[in-house]
């Protein structure tokens, strides 16, 4: 089953009052200095994500930069990246209805397979739309951007993975 995490919010927490801890990575990929918020990423996320029995794929606007700047920082291998289409009139209509701009693309990408989407911008509108338009099981898991992925989030994702039949990612 594919697990598609976003970066900003789930891996890089933001929006809370006060300071975030600074996490040191074993190695800093070239170009990291241009992204000071990368120090908020807990390197343990890499171990925890790779321990999940699923196929990881980036579902982020970081696109290829996620593999270049984030994956090495948290010891992840190069992952597939969901390619986002150019904005369209449909996206504008969806936004007016409260549907996240990633939702349609992720459902198309999943191609009827079960999938997990981890993001800080998921709403009930997205869940309702996916339930109506995706025949496979889907967990749309909202992460509090102020905290990023927590133990509770990993438990929820692990539970879903244990109770969903495995499939092959594209």
For the regions a language model picked out, list residue spans one by one.
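C-terminal cap/substrate-recognition subdomain and adjoining C-terminal extension
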Residues: 66-170
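Alpha-helical substrate-recognition element adjacent to the catalytic core
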Residues: 1-92, 162
């Amino acid at each position: 089953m594919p697990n598609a995490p976003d970066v900003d919010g789930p891996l890089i927490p933001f929006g809370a009052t006060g300071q975030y801890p600074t996490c040191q990575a074993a190695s800093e990929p070239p170009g990291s200095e241009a992204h000071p918020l990368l120090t908020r990423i807990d390197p343990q996320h890499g171990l925890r994500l790779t321990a999940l029995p699923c196929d990881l794929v980036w579902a982020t606007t970081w696109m290829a930069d996620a593999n270049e700047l984030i994956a090495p920082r948290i010891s992840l291998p190069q992952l597939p990246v969901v390619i986002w289409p150019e904005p369209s009139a449909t996206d504008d209509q969806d936004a007016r209805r409260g549907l996240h701009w990633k939702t349609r693309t992720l459902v198309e990408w999943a191609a009827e397979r079960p999938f997990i989407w981890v993001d800080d911008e998921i709403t009930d509108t997205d869940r309702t739309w996916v339930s109506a338009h995706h025949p496979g099981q889907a967990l749309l898991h909202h992460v509090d951007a102020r905290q990023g992925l927590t133990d509770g989030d990993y438990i929820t994702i692990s539970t879903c993975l244990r109770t969903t039949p495995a499939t092959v990612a594209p």
